[in-house]
Amino acid sequence: YTAKPKLDFPRIEKIHQLTGVPLVMHGGSGVSPEDYVEAIKRGVRKINYYTYMAREGTNAAKAYLKDHPDVIYYHDIACAARDAMKNDVEKAMSVFYGLKK
């Protein structure tokens, strides 16, 4: 992105009020934790979250390969990626749902 995303919170709230249906946020890359929370307060109920999680998995796989250059088992790399992705999703869920871990 060339600029930080700017969510139109009054519009989100108005759409939610007029339709009475839960809203879906497609593409949340670059959205701050505070803006996620505000969007949820205004009617967003589903957030398609992938890019940050995938990036964490990729970075973990790269780091694992760097630290273990002779690794021959894919599942070792996949486990490192999975663990990083799981950690990232847990952080996102704590923002989305206000969970304390």
Regions found by a protein language model. Name each.
Residues 42-59:
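Glycine-rich phosphate-binding active-site loops on the catalytic face of alpha/beta enzymes
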Residues 4-25:
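Alpha-helix-loop-beta-strand connector modules within alpha/beta enzyme cores
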Residues 24-26, 78-79:
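Active-site mouth loops of central-metabolism enzymes
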Residues 63-101:
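Extended, intrinsically disordered, low-complexity segments
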Residues 8, 41-43, 64-67:
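Short, hinge-like loop/turn segments at secondary-structure boundaries
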Residues 28-44:
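Catalytic cores of alpha/beta
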Residues 10-14, 38, 87, 91:
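Alpha-helical scaffolding segments of alpha/beta enzyme cores, especially the outer helices
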Residues 26-30, 50-52:
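Active-site beta-loop-alpha junctions enriched in small/polar residues
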